C-alpha cells in the first residue's frame, strides 16, 4: 500500500513532542479505491503508516480532524474510525466539505504526542 503525498507537502512533521500528519485519503498504490468504506480503511491504514514512520501508534494520537464530502457519511466513517482506534478516543473535529483531492470521499489528519524521555531517569517527562 502506498501513502505517497500527491502534492507539495510533507506527509508528517514533528515539532518537539508533537507529530502532525497531513491529511490521508483512500489511496492504495496511488489509486483511489472505490466506495466510502474501502476509502475509510485505506485512509486509516495510510494514517497508521505515517504514525509508524514517526515511531508512533494510533494510541499516541491526541486529536484528529475528519473531512467528508457528505455529512450523511458520518455514521459509516465512525464505524471504520472505531475499528482503527479501538477503545482509544482522541479529540476530534468532523467537517463536511464540498470536495476533496483525487475524488476522495473522506480525509483524516492527526496530531500525535510523543513524550520526551529524560535519558538520566529513563522515563517520560510529562
Question: Which residue ranges define each predicted feature?
Answer:
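Short, polar/acidic, helix-capping and beta-turn segments at strand->helix junctions
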Residues: 1-126
Amino acid at each position: 500500500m502506498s501513502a505517497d503525498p500527491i502534492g507539495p507537502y510533507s506527509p508528517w512533521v514533528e515539532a518537539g513532542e508533537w507529530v502532525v500528519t497531513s491529511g490521508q485519503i483512500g489511496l492504495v498504490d496511488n489509486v483511489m479505491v472505490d466506495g466510502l468504506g474501502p476509502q475509510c480503511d485505506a485512509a486509516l491504514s495510510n494514517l497508521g503508516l505515517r504514525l509508524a514512520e514517526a515511531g508512533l501508534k494510533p494510541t499516541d494520537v491526541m486529536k484528529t480532524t475528519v473531512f467528508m464530502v457528505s455529512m450523511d457519511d458520518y455514521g459509516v466513517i465512525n464505524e471504520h474510525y472505531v475499528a482503527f482506534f479501538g477503545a482509544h478516543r482522541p479529540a476530534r473535529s468532523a467537517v463536511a466539505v464540498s470536495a476533496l483531492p483525487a475524488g476522495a470521499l473522506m480525509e483524516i489528519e492527526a496530531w500525535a504526542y510523543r513524550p520526551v524521555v529524560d535519558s538520566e531517569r529513563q522515563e517520560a517527562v510529562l
